[in-house]
Amino acid sequence: MVLLLLAGLLLPGQKEQPELQGKIFPAITNHLKIISTDGKSIDTIHEKAQKELAKVIAEQYQLGKELSIILVCTGNSRRSMMGAAMGNASAAYHGFSDLRFYSGGTTPSAFNSRSIRALKEIGFKIEPTGGKTKPGPKGEDNPFYQVSWLIDKGWNCIEFSKHYSDPKNPQKDFIALMVCDEADSACTVVMGAKKRIPVPFADPKAFDGKPEEAAKYSERRDDIGRFMLSTLAIAKEQLKSK
């Protein structure tokens, strides 16, 4: 039987952890607590995806074996980037030590500075490494960034805009979350994915350069974060019944 603690997982043969949650940067933990208790629910259009994702996580999660999820959108610039970051922080918050989130696109561009700002606003540490890869389709500079959410550096990652099939991402047996309608329509088959789940979120790009720009990026970050937190909470309850 899999036993669950409020702040994390306790699996057979595993001692009660210095909880993974305790390694998250405090500002991120505080923000996750706020959006998980603010009384807001996920959108109705996401409920089916939530049930589907929670079910597959509960069925396939195993301690010591990574379960990989790639968030896919067109440009791998905004929603997929923020979604992977919020997914990884949410996994740590709920104690899923072997659940990892990645990002990718169908037409990669660059990690948008507004997405970076929205994540840094709640405590993520995002710093350029000095390296970069090939530019986006419009000639955008595409630097590498170190993205950190945990004190333990081994859990953090290097992010850059890339095709979902980039060698830096899992190549097979991953779950694909299609977080934009365009990618969902253009990429009906995600090569290597064992499960493909559409869960579209509105693109904050529509507000670039407008007075509400920062607020809309923060809103989308929190919408995706709330989806991740509540989905993993459901998966924990389903694991509990095994």
PLM features: what roles do these ranges have?
Residues 4-5, 98:
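N-terminal low-hydrophobic presequence detector
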Residues 5-18:
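Bacterial Sec-dependent signal peptides at the C-terminal "C-region" and cleavage site
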Residues 16-242:
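Short polar/charged helix/loop
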